[in-house]
């Protein structure tokens, strides 16, 4: 980062650390640009417990796994949320505040068809789905499964963390 970037009251990010090769180093560079008593806050998704509650929804379960396998194939850390507290501590941020929230969805109200549709080319590029995989068939199977099985499930977890940076 340029040294003349300045100082900020807060630095926030969402779903970015999971895609960085060295998130701790990135945060280390960022906190140098915090004002005294500045806040650094991040929210990251995590695949922990994904699919819990959806035992009667095998197509939904497969869709969740395809999304996470694609992110992982692209170099994303699908468990970064669980690591945030330790990373903040290693940066010298004392007593960071951390929360986790389950992203609950239902068979009839979820974003898995949309996610699959926008990620389909990425899924194909990483061989997560075969060339014969069709969105129309997938959507039909998901819709039929939702009509037959009313269930709620955890799609993923959101981890949020914030703390005050150290200033030397």
What is the predicted role of each segment?
Residues 13-17, 43:
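Residues lining the SAM
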Residues 95-153:
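C-terminal helical/coil "lid" or tail adjacent to the Rossmann-like core of SAM-dependent
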Residues 21, 35, 93:
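Short conserved AdoMet
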Residues 9, 58-60, 114-117:
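Short, hinge-like loop/turn segments at secondary-structure boundaries
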Residues 41-110, 125-128:
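Conserved catalytic/acceptor-binding region of the Class I
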């Amino acid at each position: 980062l340029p040294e003349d970037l300045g100082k900020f009251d807060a630095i926030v990010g969402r779903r970015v650390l999971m895609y960085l090769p060295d998130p701790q180093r990135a945060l280390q560079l960022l906190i140098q640009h915090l004002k005294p008593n500045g806040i650094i806050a991040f929210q990251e998704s995590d695949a922990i417990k994904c699919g819990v509650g959806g035992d009667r929804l095998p197509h939904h379960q497969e869709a969740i796994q395809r999304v996470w396998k694609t992110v992982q194939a692209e170099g994303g850390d699908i468990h970064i949320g669980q690591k945030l507290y330790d990373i903040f501590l290693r940066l010298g941020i004392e007593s960071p505040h951390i929360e986790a929230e389950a992203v609950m969805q239902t068979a009839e109200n979820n974003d898995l068809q949309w996610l699959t549709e926008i990620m389909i080319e990425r899924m194909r590029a990483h061989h997560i789905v075969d060339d014969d995989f069709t969105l129309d068939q997938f959507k039909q199977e998901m819709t039929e499964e939702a009509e037959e099985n009313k269930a709620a499930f955890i799609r993923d977890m959101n981890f949020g963390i914030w703390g005050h940076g150290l200033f030397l």
